[in-house]
Amino acid sequence: MVSSLKYLVFVLVAFASQLSLAADITPKMQKNIDVYKTKIVQWAADPVIVNAVKEANARGAIPMMGNAKWREIDPKDPLIQGFETNAAGVLVTKWMNADPKGINKIVVSGNKSQRVAFTSMPAIYIGKGKPNFDEAFSGKVWQQPESKPDPSTQIDTVQIAAPIKDGGEVIGVLLVSLTASNL
């Protein structure tokens, strides 16, 4: 009986700690998020972003690169630095640095959800199967329903994403992590 009670308490504490990681979005936050959503739709149409995604889609994903292998790479590796220093990486870093309290990460992905450019190394290389990629790639502007720690930065974040289009065709996704405490 005592061990069952201890187990129940353990399960409840573990569940409660997981709940504390996510937080509701307030009406004030939503108003600010909506402003960012409008902004990222414009960013997703920037010719530098569109051209980088078109080129990356033509090359394809890095051969044999999966999420497990990606996690083993040092963020200072030249491969990773290339995503930050290519034309799209420089542009998204400029956008983030213009709003350092509001934006903590930007990631550009191609049509196979492979990374094209980013401001800092994301936790995964392939985003397919995640709502932030799948919803935006279907042509919708996507928003995370609550704030929670970003997997790579651990900053309490609300992620938003917009489709990157070439004409009317969706060719990639622009993901922006907003710092929840500044919304």
Task: Give the predicted meaning of each segment.
Residues M1-V9:
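Bacterial N-terminal signal peptides that target proteins for export
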Residues A22-K76, P100-G102, W142:
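Juxtamembrane extracytoplasmic/periplasmic/luminal helical "stalk" adjacent to the first N-terminal
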Residues Q30, L79-G102, L178-L183:
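Solvent-exposed, extracytoplasmic
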Residues D77-T93, S120-P149:
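Extracytoplasmic/periplasmic sensor domains and loops in membrane signaling proteins
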Residues K105-K112:
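Short hydrophobic alpha-helical segments used for membrane anchoring or interfacial signaling
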Residues Q114-T119:
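Amphipathic coiled-coil signal-relay and dimerization helices
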Residues I155-L183:
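Conserved beta-strands of PAS-like sensory domains
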